[in-house]
Amino acid sequence: ERGDTNRDFSLGKNKRYVLGINFGPYKTQEYYNNIHNMLSNVEDVCFRDKYSYNLFKDLPNVRQAADIVFSMDMSNIKNTNRKRAIISIISPKDKINKKYKKQYEEKMLELISFLIVKGYEICLMSFCKIEHDEEEIEEIYSKIPENQKKKVEKYYYNGNIEEALNTIADSQLVVGGRFHANIIGLCLGKSILPVLYSDKTLHVLQDMQIDTPIIDIRNLESFDIKSITDDDLTRHYDVEKQKEDAQRHFEKLDLQLKKT
């Protein structure tokens, strides 16, 4: 919302398609009105969650389908069952508020220790350098006890999507601080443990009726790591329906491309 203006995406005679998006969180009616006006001027809008769709369903050009990443072809990715947990780390000061930083780091360190005791190897994964994921990983890693560090490695995404997907595929569990860490984990048949900094991940999990413990950065004091069961760490979900539904994001665009 910061610095928002009443944007216009109509851009002359060119048709515009806005696919795979969510809306929120938002604070002001003015911001909502600006986005509503902007979306009313594009050819097609396809949201990834029902919460966002319901906010704009009065517009005739608005649709909803499963998250667009479910449509990715991952058939060439080497999936393993290595007892490893991918932990997608975020920087609280960039994604939510710096006041959560200390408590977030303490909870991640507790989780790392908890998983190592259960026999997991750990990979701390950065999805976004510009939002300081890597800096946060270095801070957390520096606080891991020396006798546990041999079980922990780091992976920094550098634009090589296939390499990143293979890294995630070489695991059993994805602890998703980044929204799409959870979605990719589900696509690859992994168990997931979401870490929320806003409700956008929650909205999609609710749409999918996924029942898993959720670590909410905004309410860390109420989450007991020891409450996570072995069943929680090994639960799997059938997402074939979502993989098929996600293809619908492109249906209007495909029609347009066939005309040109």
Put a short name on every predicted segment:
Residues E1-T260:
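Active-site anion-handling motifs in enzyme catalytic cores
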